Amino acid sequence: MKPQSINSTMDSTIERLGDKLKTIGEVRERCGVGSISFGILHHGEVIFTGSTGHRDVLEKKEPDTSTLYTLCSISKSFIAAALGILVHQGKCKWTDAVGRYIPEFKPKGDVRVATKATFNDFLRHSGGLANPVVTLLGPEGKVLVSQEDFINVLNDAPNGNERFGTYYSRTWEYSNVSHGLLALVIERISEKRYADFISEEILKPLGMNDTVVYKSRLSSDANIAHSYVRLSDGSWCKQPDHEWTNECNTPVLAMVGIRSSIKDLLIWSAATMDAQWGEESKPLAALSNIEMNPLREVNSILNKAYWTRPHKDDLQTLSNFHLSWYKCVMPSSMVHWGSWNMSLADNGNKDQNYINENILGRDSPQQPLYKITGIGFCGTASVNLFPKTMSAVVVLGSGLNTGDPSDFTAAIMIQALFDLKKQIDIIPMVSYEREMRLRDWKSLKNDWNKHRDIYSVEHPAKEYVGEYTGLGITLTVRANAVSEGLQLIFNGREEIMQNLEYYNEDMYSYQPINRDNWLRGGWLDWDHFMVGILHFKRKNGLVSGVTWVWERGCDAALFNKGNT
């Protein structure tokens, strides 16, 4: 643990923060991840930073304020900021239909997704596109689709389902791919590669010199927090390095691939608040080395267009999703919004009494909170802005295992920073979350076993061999050259070939059902037993396609077999 007080005077606020270092170490241990780094901005000044664990567990290298973590969905805040600059320059409007800038965007189904859905719509996740991210991001951190082929994913992405109907302007449907679309539009409007625009228009003017949008910056000796997770036997596993940070694949970089540090995200937080609430007569200390804040249209990003995010806590304060940022008013259960702590906020496993009992600052004055979070197999991240005091709490974690360490650490530091009442003991929440995540896995595995029937008719493997196209990619099923089984290849990526296991008649499974193997492989969420199962379909007795339930609750996507 390496705390570092920036202020020369250890006032009561900094003392409270320092008292929480041991607790944050416990969070990391119980969540089973390699490292956590954090920083606190208060009254526009960086007052506290720290870290726990190792950015490289095997070599015992500790993280610091410049250590690089993958931002995952926090990357999306740069999309909104880039569009804000372009809107300010008069090159586009928030209310423009996005499809006018990219005519090859021709989604199947609801054409309004291209002809009417605006920048506002897509940034607040009401543009109508679903989230088939598993067709983009494969196991072991591999990217499955090139930038050139990304348009095929967009055009194939569902824009409704059988139960609900169309999504556009009717519901909040979180969509990574829609943000990839916006990044491509930014390239069209600016006539620059997205990475170049972000670097030249945002990162360099703000002095965010740690932040990485170019693959070449990721050398073997770079100050990177590698993703480590603790396995069931107590050993540490280094997960695969991902391919998400690459300027040559704008959609993936913009959605989830930017890497940054605590130092730079504190600048990012200060610049965002300064652009909206700053006063020229009172420059923020955190921006003392900045000649000019390049951020524009921040009020439009943070406070105008939004989609409500209803929740069921007993306080019922404001809860809206704006343009890449979420806004609530504390006290609220939604302080934990967007995290991988599934027992909190509006996430899946809901015990409302438990949620209400653990609301931070229930007896403290109300104040607005703006936040954005990131979740990936490689780690979690949490950025929290408090404009009332020009404060920010930023947390970055490497690895994802049993709970969201960044969210818990943010809660600990928010509570200490503002001395919230009544105080909540976070550690029992961490233990409960860990128990729930392991229980969920056991339940998932039980469902997988319950629906399996290995005694059903198994047809000759050669009937399934072929290429199946859908959702913008190709699934290749081939015979195993060594055994009598089948193998699955995602969109030509031979290096992540998966052996298929017989599951039921015309059904084969590729997902690991051993949790340690799931962690080793760097898989995305496996939240339903059918997500890892291919269900082959027949026409006139011959295999004609395969359906894939790629996400809990989605309609099964059909992949058509070639030459049928």
Listing of model-derived features with the role each one plays in the protein:
Residues 53-57, 400-402, 551-552:
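A short acidic/small-residue loop/turn micro-motif
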Residues 316, 330-355, 359-368, 407-564:
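Peripheral terminal and inter-domain segments
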Residues 45, 54-56, 110-376, 381:
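Short, surface-exposed loop or secondary-structure junction motifs
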Residues 11-71, 91-93, 106-107, 155-165:
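Short, conserved catalytic-motif segment at the N-terminal edge
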